[in-house]
């Protein structure tokens, strides 16, 4: 449910601010002693958050960064939605929060009862009866459980069956408990179907002995991407009494092998004598390498001493892993729903990228060859256009070991695939989305020390990407707009430009230019740090290329503001649509957004952006209009739903803040960057109301943990608004106390007495390790030392206080020489 708004507390007027600050200083002398994380912290996660509307999360079981997931399949392309009325099966591969069709659900398994044979309940003479849409089971939400590492649901068809799932990194387990005490219970293993709109191109299934089924399936995935193969193995805890396979021609009792082609039915059934036990446990594993990889993974994580691990043991191991991961961040304050929302966000931020190498270290690279990761983990599934904005930084902050291996993985992709990725899916590049997200992503990894020992290799790959384009025969698109960008300073807007995937940069020339400039500025800082002075200077200048697409004459008719980014054509002219009028609210030239929303994507050059908007006062007014600031301050609990963009795919004909998509995620902190941090606090508090303990409790697609990571940073009071800079902007925390174990032996401690997520509160002052801290930001070098941050909060906005002086604002690396914020 959504949190019930509470009446605003009456601001205290009995103690002056100095007295409150003195009290805070006294508190700083005592050590922070947050209670240890609860032993059942995994139960504070609600995996159903994001499973309704378009959050596109999955409710089933996964380990942190797991290779395998077990979750229900319904009628949606991402797997299952909370309001689906049937479960078609339990798939074994899912992405969390992605917004493209053709994804996941491979190896659809469902327990059923009834007769299988000629003329039976499952008539082997009719292949259509083995379609998982036809045999899908009804179910009930009553008693349904979605915890970190554990899922349970009651199937109400077939006499009633309890289905449970748990997962370790490379192996999973399902337990099916039938209500019937006699007759046969069957497990259908469907390899010819997966999630809705995810076509199986070819599949093979083999029944081995009386306990095993294994095989492979080839799918073409993610918005028309390249095909790839998933191998699987399932072992049961007791022998099946009968078996068979089905294919295009129907079912064959007793058959052990079936191979079918594109979109053809294919699978196997295994029959168990329920008089000998009502429960059947299946332990499964998958691999993207080969059949032996799936077997190796099952032996390594689903067995011990040659015997299958029991379901309960695997659940214990899975949830112990989650308990440790979740316990690295501890919060105090708020209510039960606040804690659930927070820890569910931590959970979702740690699902991806997914482990890509098998237990023996082997993985399938972007050259389709087999490689080995010795002593490190190779990862797969990188939604970089999304994750470079918040999730990458969250992992670097809390899991530096994972961040290091992610960096190593991206360099392996570059080495084996010939170029750096943008949206990597399994072992291929999809070329989904636009811009140059890999550059700020990797520069942040460098900034956070995750590329240590590989800085030179990373620089070479990033420089090649920034100054060139992949060859035509490469799957990678890279910066496809570079030919005009390097020559003229902007990406041409050309809807006819040939694409290597669904997206290509010139189709969205306006936003691509802004993304390139942001990336160049980030890379300039890396070049400077590595001693490449000439490249640093060139890239720094290119970091101001957002100005090349800023048209000072464009006027928004309704609000009266003048000057917006606008796409340009090959001849250098401003793009003008057929009707002769360009609107900054239109769809022309910007990817999943409008010029109104993209105008803020120049945070690397705040003085220049403010100058383009006619000064700080006008920039502030424009932000006020963008966020509906008057409405937010009047009704912070509800204004976001009334005033901002609501639909997750309502990209165009908009001028307000869109909390459902990535281009705007940093924009609340533009207020802070121009010296109005109290307004950042108001926007962030209003936006947090959109994250609730409910199936629709995330904003838009969660995008592999991106929205969840945004929420986490918003809740603890620091945010990385300028990629590549290492600057974390400070704002009002949601919780009174926070501790973050940073993976380097140090702990970040945050103290905000009186923090209340249902009230507008503003920062009156900050202390770092007991010393007054006037700047509105903290550098990564200081943050990684594990300081104690103390926030003094008040209900009154300090329009002349903390964070309002220009000297206390971070310097924009790519501001023009001599420019100042005015």
What do the PLM-derived regions correspond to, one by one?
Residues 1-17:
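N-terminal secretory signal peptides that target proteins for export/translocation
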Residues 20-31:
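Bacterial N-terminal signal peptides
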